[in-house]
């Protein structure tokens, strides 16, 4: 039996779904850790779908970089970044028991951009520009690494993909009501989009800052390096175009105040952890 739904009802559903009114679906992807991040999230795309799509998208990015001879061109720098990642990855268990077993990948791409990112499931890319132009210390690289890992741990990409699904569902319902057809959804393209194109919200950025300093501290890196990092970023962006990494982040002043508070909170973790890496 075909259920017939009136156009006014379809339009109401489109508005309801498009507005994201599904608060009953909230879940928390991570444990609180010392920094206490525990916001509930709406996740409509399955974790398995998101990770599989991200793996494919990451493979495309790496394949293109390899073709253009821009992949891991500096062996020493690549090793340096991977060693830092290897110290931080075990610390992810504090927030998610499954995370250390993810299929983590870390690569360095030849690019002048001040950027780095981590796709769902632990697919990381650092651009040479951010390390070389800012003359980053290991602790400052760890601050960026922890921040980007935190996006994956909190599944911010999956959360943003879910928001896109909500919007597209609303459009499809609207299309059914108006006869305009449906909007397709390519999850691989979406995984690429939510990592490289769509901006994170300031909430996402603040969560990642806080979790990031804890990951760095637990890995034996001074969490206060996150502050010197953003001071360097501030200096690098004065009078110029805002780097992709900073395009939607909180203001430098707000961020530094928050980082000072949370770096102080996790500093004892750093003092304990650094003994293991002498």
Over which residues does each language-model region extend?
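A Zn2+-metalloprotease active-site environment signal
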Residues: 2-12, 17, 21-278
């Amino acid at each position: 039996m075909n259920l017939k739904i009136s156009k006014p009802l379809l339009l109401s559903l489109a508005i309801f779904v498009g507005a994201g009114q599904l608060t009953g679906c909230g879940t928390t992807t991570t444990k609180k850790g010392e920094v206490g991040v525990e916001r509930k999230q709406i996740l409509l795309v399955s974790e398995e779908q998101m990770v599989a799509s991200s793996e494919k998208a990451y493979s495309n990015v790496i394949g293109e970089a390899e073709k253009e001879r821009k992949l891991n061109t500096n062996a020493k720098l690549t090793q340096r970044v991977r060693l830092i990642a290897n110290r931080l990855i075990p610390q992810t268990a504090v927030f998610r028991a499954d995370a250390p077993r993810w299929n983590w990948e870390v690569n360095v791409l030849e690019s002048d951009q001040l950027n780095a990112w981590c796709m769902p499931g632990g697919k990381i890319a650092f651009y040479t520009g951010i390390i070389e132009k800012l003359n980053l210390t290991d602790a400052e690289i760890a601050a960026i690494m922890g921040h980007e890992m935190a996006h994956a741990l909190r599944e911010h990409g999956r959360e943003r993909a879910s928001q896109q699904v909500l919007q597209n569902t609303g459009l499809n319902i609207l299309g059914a009501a108006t006869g305009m057809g449906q909007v397709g959804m390519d999850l691989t393209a979406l995984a690429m989009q939510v990592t490289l194109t769509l901006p994170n919200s300031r909430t996402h950025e603040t969560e990642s800052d806080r979790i990031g300093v804890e990951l760095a501290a637990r890995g034996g890196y001074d969490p206060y390096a996150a502050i010197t990092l953003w001071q360097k970023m501030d200096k690098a962006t004065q009078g110029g175009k805002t780097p992709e990494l900073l395009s939607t982040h909180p203001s430098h002043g707000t961020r530094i105040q928050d980082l000072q508070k949370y770096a102080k909170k996790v500093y004892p973790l750093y003092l304990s952890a650094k003994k293991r890496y002498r």
